């Protein structure tokens, strides 16, 4: 009896423990189910989760320019060298000792300016001798003419023969010939004396002297005394491809002088402006180019002989052309294209047909219109339809630095 009583209590205790365990099990399961919707909702509201947590980074910064309509000049370009209009080596035409130089190296001189002097003593002596001989022979001629006049009277009275009259006539003629020779000798001596004073044959700039005062010089010296280069005006000889010849000839036929500009080696500074002078009469078969000569007044001495320059010749002007910065024009598998911005700052690729272009701007013949906005910088980050941030040129770097800083901040937070 006592044993069965204990067995019943054991069964009761086991049942109670099982009931408590079941209660806690079902209570925990219900808590998990009720917590799941809240956790999901919280995740959706969290900045780090859902769509808001996966939003894209900052907009790509770009620079843009507006296509404009303007008149665009068409230039032909070539490489060339400045050449003097005339180059003269000043030499002495007589032999003698150089006693004076009357120029400063590098100065501008005019035709007729005295440059140098050779000792004139010997030439003065020769002139005096020639003049003396001329005077002597003139006196002889005067006496012969008087004798001839007397002979002409005496022959009428037969006091002199006809033969004597003819002889006297021949003497007069001979003396007249001698006078002419004497006059030529005087002129030659005077010329030699004049040549002892050496003058500039042309206007121009004198170079460095080739001989010093005191030296004996002669007319056969090849180096001369000094070289004069005529730089007012001055010429530019440059080359153009043979394919441009027809364009130049057509522009010449229009009747207006073609303007030629001379630019420095780096093509960054305009040195002077002149006009086309002539085309060569044949093409260089080796290079396929033709030589062209232009002339410049060069009153400011901006150009020097043998100076290397870049030539630009204006041959035409294209009116009402659509122009954009050259930086906006890109090349792809499909050809040339530009990125065009719409009113919402979204970009789209437009295929275009380029025309005249230089380092700064390019004419677009088809593909866009005046007023369209095109991307000029930040092009490598673009995709079709992407929205961008248009920034000023001076702030583009700042925008990129800000974007980079944000990216680094994100990486730091994740790490």
Curated annotation (Swiss-Prot):
Residues 399-415 have a biased composition (Basic and acidic residues). The keyword Glycoprotein does not apply. It is found in: Cell inner membrane. SUPFAM superfamilies: HlyD-like secretion proteins. GO terms for cellular component: efflux pump complex; plasma membrane. Induction: The mdtABC operon is transcriptionally activated by BaeR. Keywords: Cell inner membrane, Cell membrane, Membrane, Signal, Transport. Residues 32-59, 392-415 are annotated as: Disordered. Gene3D superfamilies: 2.40.30.170, 2.40.420.20, 2.40.50.100, Helix hairpin bin. Part of a tripartite efflux system composed of MdtA, MdtB and MdtC. The MdtABC tripartite complex confers resistance against novobiocin and deoxycholate. This is Multidrug resistance protein MdtA. It comes from Escherichia coli O17:K52:H18 (strain UMN026 / ExPEC). The lineage of its organism: Bacteria, Pseudomonadati, Pseudomonadota, Gammaproteobacteria, Enterobacterales.
């Amino acid at each position: 009896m006592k044993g069965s009583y204990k067995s019943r209590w054991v069964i009761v205790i086991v049942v109670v423990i099982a009931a408590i365990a079941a209660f806690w099990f079902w209570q925990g399961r219900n808590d998990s189910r009720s917590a799941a919707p809240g956790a999901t909702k919280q995740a959706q509201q969290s900045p780090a989760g859902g769509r808001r947590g996966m939003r894209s980074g900052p907009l790509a910064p770009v620079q843009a320019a507006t296509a404009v309509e303007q008149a665009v000049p068409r230039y032909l370009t070539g490489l060339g060298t400045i050449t003097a209009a005339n180059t003269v080596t000043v030499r002495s035409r007589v032999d003698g000792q150089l006693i004076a130089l009357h120029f400063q190296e590098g100065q501008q001189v005019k035709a007729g300016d005295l440059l140098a002097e050779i000792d004139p003593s010997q030439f003065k002596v020769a002139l005096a001798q020639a003049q003396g001989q001329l005077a002597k022979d003139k006196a002889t001629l005067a006496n012969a003419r008087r004798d001839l006049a007397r002979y002409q009277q005496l022959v009428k009275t037969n006091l002199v023969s006809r033969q004597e009259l003819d002889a006297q006539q021949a003497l007069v003629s001979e003396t007249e010939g001698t006078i002419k020779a004497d006059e030529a000798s005087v002129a030659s001596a005077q010329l030699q004396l004049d040549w002892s004073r050496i003058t500039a044959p042309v206007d121009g700039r004198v170079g460095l002297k080739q001989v010093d005062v005191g030296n004996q010089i002669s007319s056969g010296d090849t180096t001369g005394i000094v070289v004069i280069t005529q730089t007012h005006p001055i010429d530019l000889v440059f080359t153009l491809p043979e394919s441009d010849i027809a364009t130049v000839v057509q522009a010449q036929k229009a009747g207006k002088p073609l303007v030629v500009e001379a630019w420095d080696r780096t093509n960054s500074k305009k040195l002077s402006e002149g006009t086309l002078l002539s085309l060569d009469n044949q093409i260089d078969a080796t290079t396929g180019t033709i030589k062209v000569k232009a002339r410049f007044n060069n009153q400011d001495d901006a150009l020097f002989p043998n100076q290397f320059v870049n030539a630009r010749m204006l041959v035409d002007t294209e009116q009402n052309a659509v122009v954009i910065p050259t930086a906006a024009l890109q090349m792809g598998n499909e050809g040339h294209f530009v990125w065009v911005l719409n009113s919402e700052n979204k970009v789209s690729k437009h295929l275009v047909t380029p025309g005249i272009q230089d380092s700064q701007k390019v004419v677009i013949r088809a593909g866009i219109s005046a007023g369209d906005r095109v991307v000029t910088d930040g092009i490598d980050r673009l995709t079709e339809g992407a929205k961008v941030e248009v920034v000023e040129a001076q702030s583009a770097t700042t925008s990129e630095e800000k974007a980079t800083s944000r990216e680094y901040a994100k990486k730091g937070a994740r790490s």
